[in-house]
Amino acid sequence: KSGGIRASGSITAEDRQFWSFQPVKDVTPPAVKNGAWPRRPLDQFVLAQLDANGLSPVGEADKRTFIRRATFDLIGLPPTPNDVAAFIADESPLAHERLINRLLESPHYGERWARHWLDVARYGEDQAHTFQARMYPNGYRYRDWVVSAFNNDLPYNQFVIEQIAGDLLPDANGRLERLPALGYLALGPVYYKDAGCAGKAESDEVDDRIDTLCRGFLG
C-alpha cells in the first residue's frame, strides 16, 4: 500500500524488442550436424537446439506406439484394434502421413481440440454457480460452431471475426450460420438485477465480456 505508483504509458526500446511484437519474417533454418535427420525445415531448429545442449534425437517410435500417440493426441481416443492392425500392416512409406490425415479428417478431431477454445470462452450451458440457476438452452449451438470451425479448418482471422462481429459482416448469405459464433460474447454470466443494484449488475456483465475478449485475443 505504501509503494509508489507505477508509471503508465512508458514503453522502452527494450520492451519493443519482445518477440511477440516483431513482424513475421522468413528465417533461414540453422545448419545442423546430422543433415539426414530433419524431414522439414522446422526439424532443423529442433535439432540445432538439441546439438547446442549436447543431446541427440531419440529413435523413431515403433508403429504400435506411434498410432497410439497420434490417435490420443489428435482425437483424444485410443485407436481400435483394427486400426492398429491395419497401420502395422501398411508398409507404404506414406503410411504415417495417411494416418495423420485420417485423424485430422475425423469429426472427433474438432471435438477434441475445440474444448481448449471453449475453456478460453468460459463455455457453459448453465449458470449453476449463482443462487438463481440459469440455463442456456441454445448454448450448444456455440459449442457445435466451434467444433465445426476446427473440423472445417476455418482460418483463424475469420474464426476471430465471426465470434466478435459475425452478425455485422456484409455477406448476408452466411449470416444464420455465423450467428452461433456470437456465443463467445453471449454465454457469459447474467446477474440478478433488483431495484438497488441493476446498474452494478449490468456493469459486471459488461466487464466479464471485456475481460473474456481481452484475455482470449490479446493475452
Feature map (PLM): residue ranges:
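Short, structured secondary-structure elements
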Residues: 6-219
